[in-house]
Amino acid sequence: KPHRYRPGTVALRSTELLIRKLPFQREIAQDFKTDLRDIQLAR
């Protein structure tokens, strides 16, 4: 018998992961943009 998660648990875990990732990605995107700008200026 395969182990089954309760539907609520999975939804909660995935949303939690999304919430944790989103601000992080936003920061990375901004850092990435500034890095690109610096690289272009340095050329």
From Swiss-Prot:
Subcellular location: Nucleus; Chromosome
Keywords per UniProt: Chromosome, DNA-binding, Nucleosome core, Nucleus
GO MF terms, alphabetically ordered: DNA binding; protein heterodimerization activity; structural constituent of chromatin
InterPro entries linked: Histone-fold, Histone_H3/CENP-A
Residue ranges the record marks as coiled coil: none
Domain of life: Eukaryota
Keyword DNA-binding among record annotations: yes
GO cellular component, one term: nucleosome
Keyword Membrane annotated: no
Record-linked PANTHER family: HISTONE H3
Function: Core component of nucleosome. Nucleosomes wrap and compact DNA into chromatin, limiting DNA accessibility to the cellular machineries which require DNA as a template. Histones thereby play a central role in transcription regulation, DNA repair, DNA replication and chromosomal stability. DNA accessibility is regulated via a complex set of post-translational modifications of histones, also called histone code, and nucleosome remodeling.
Quaternary assembly: The nucleosome is a histone octamer containing two molecules each of H2A, H2B, H3 and H4 assembled in one H3-H4 heterotetramer and two H2A-H2B heterodimers. The octamer wraps approximately 147 bp of DNA.
Similarity remark: Belongs to the histone H3 family.
Protein name: Histone H3
